[in-house]
């Protein structure tokens, strides 16, 4: 029997790759080893009912982000989203889902049986009509959403700030807007030197904090990883002490990168100065990424002609190598972006689910959240009518598709 995954990971690690992908420790030595991998002992506290060293770590998180309360999560921002929505359900059922949201939001909003409304923006929206509002800021491409209109709303405001965990540590980066959001979800491992799965939740409200802790006790694994928690602890302390200097270096090197990039590309302007989104000007970004990988350079993701790199204090020194490699690549293959159109919603009450080959699912009603990953934003959600155009896109081998079961798509029976 061959250990397939271990072999693949070992081969990758031994190749000394240039990594512009999460987790944001980028393969450095975190000084955490398996001898520290323990369970709840007399001295090590308990995440679900923290009152010792874990509680102290969570207090550090709150202090670092200038909030009253912080919670640690070891099973990723997906669990943090579930906890936030479970907490919101205590207020009421009416949920506004604002703009593009991660698949986990769609999934848990359905599991928790919210009465869901959708809007691309806050135009013509009265926030007080809802019990809760959830939005993404920053998004996968470093754009921050303006939520000033939500400042005095009676709705519970949830910010999925998974990609903004580093914002608090440098004055040139955007504000997390924790003064407006009642609950803020962070994915530490995306932008900080934290093991995969490290996430957190912030709030300034005592009653919400109590409800979040209660929800965590229900939804979080009772076997949290102490190694992940230790990496969060170290990262928060390191960034609180040195984040301003470290990210100044990152931002400066990105500015130099832009100057050395040839005119076949341009870097898109972002609110997050560390999220590098390189436009290949309608050339096939997937082919460019394959050529970069042949040079042992790995990006976070490709989105048509956009190449996304997560730049951190631990990989910014490799930006000249990325610029040089891109400048040597000159492909002629064009690519058109697929515009995701909002699908027609169909009533799915009391219908059963079956699984079809995706090519046979035209004009059927989707029973899952389906899209490409990254960025993890669904193209289809529960109740959407499946079109031929969407199927053509999802069957393009350039993408990693989520939501399919052994290549089949869940649909409701006619």
Go through each PLM region and give its residues:
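N-terminal "arm"/small-domain region of PLP-dependent enzymes with the aminotransferase-like
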Residues: 1-52, 182
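Conserved PLP-enzyme active-site core in the AAT-like
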Residues: 2-10, 64, 72, 76-266, ...
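Conserved N-terminal alpha-helix of the aminotransferase class I/II PLP-enzyme fold
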Residues: 34, 38-76, 100
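Short hydrophobic alpha-helical segments of the AMP-binding
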Residues: 61, 109, 383
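Generic structural signal for buried aliphatic residues
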Residues: 95, 379, 383-386
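Conserved C-terminal alpha-helix-loop-beta "cap" of PLP-dependent enzymes
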Residues: 262-382, 393-404
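Charge-dense polyanion-binding interfaces
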Residues: 400-414
